[in-house]
């Protein structure tokens, strides 16, 4: 793995990396985020009693849409043909909702940013739908858990 930054040109200005010479490989990235809230708020999400609707269904769709649009909001991301996006939720305890996003493609560049964007927007959507009853919700941490495929090799959080 290289420590050299690749998003700058000879004039030290930002550029989109040229991936035309890279090999096409299967790539998978998994990201996680969480949102902490009052126990009553999480209970109402679990029971489907939020006035704006089914929070998890809307957040799931928002996460999928965000992954597909990542290249439009992160300036140096490449537009990618994503082959799979999965957003999952877990009630970690009485105050924490965990969000996991898995994004897949077969291409010349990875999908880490798509996975991170997916879980971030899913968490923001939960916040938006519940803010009327709980403005003290906290989003994070958000992190890349793993990525496979590509020139830089595989990454699994916690492994050396």
UniProtKB/Swiss-Prot annotation:
The active site is at residue 128. Keywords: Lyase, Molybdenum cofactor biosynthesis. One of its GO terms (biological process) is Mo-molybdopterin cofactor biosynthetic process. It catalyses: (8S)-3',8-cyclo-7,8-dihydroguanosine 5'-triphosphate = cyclic pyranopterin phosphate + diphosphate. GO terms for molecular function: cyclic pyranopterin monophosphate synthase activity. It is an enzyme of class 4 (lyase). CDD domains: MoaC_PE (cd01420). Pathway: Cofactor biosynthesis; molybdopterin biosynthesis. Substrate binds at residues 76-78, 113-114. Its EC number is 4.6.1.17. Catalyzes the conversion of (8S)-3',8-cyclo-7,8-dihydroguanosine 5'-triphosphate to cyclic pyranopterin monophosphate (cPMP). HAMAP family: MoaC_B (MF_01224_B). Belongs to the MoaC family. Homohexamer; trimer of dimers. This is Cyclic pyranopterin monophosphate synthase. The gene is moaC.
